[in-house]
Amino acid sequence: MTDQQLDYQVTVEELSALMKRTAGVHVDPVTLRQQADDGFDTFGLDSLGLLGIVAELEKRYGLGLPEQAERCKTPADFLALVNGALKTGV
């Protein structure tokens, strides 16, 4: 992993694209941003879909994300946890 990757932040737009690509759930990024504190289930994403997103990010960055990432209930919580892990390399 490079220093550039450590500074990288997963955006709402990227999360929206990952939801579509890995779980087949289409959510407009604007809606996702406006409702970031709503549960993933509100958008039709279940725990297996979230697991797919976690796996994709781990593969992309070569970094094991914290186990809590798979249990995040909202997009806001997920992005905060993932971006914190990317920043610290944990």
UniProtKB/Swiss-Prot annotation:
The protein's UniProt keywords, in alphabetical order, are: Phosphopantetheine, Phosphoprotein
Sequence ranges assigned to domain Carrier in this UniProt record:
9-90
O-(pantetheine 4'-phosphoryl)serine: modified positions: 47
Q: What top-level branch of life does the organism fall under?
A: Bacteria
Key word Ribonucleoprotein present:
no
- InterPro entries assigned: ACP-like_sf, PP-bd_ACP, Ppantetheine_attach_site
The entry's comment on post-translational modification says: 4'-phosphopantetheine is transferred from CoA to a specific serine of the apo-ACP-like protein.
Entry function: Involved in developmentally regulated synthesis of a compound biosynthetically related to polyketide antibiotics which is essential for spore color in Streptomyces coelicolor.
| UniProt protein name | Probable acyl carrier protein
Give the source species.
Streptomyces coelicolor (strain ATCC BAA-471 / A3(2) / M145)
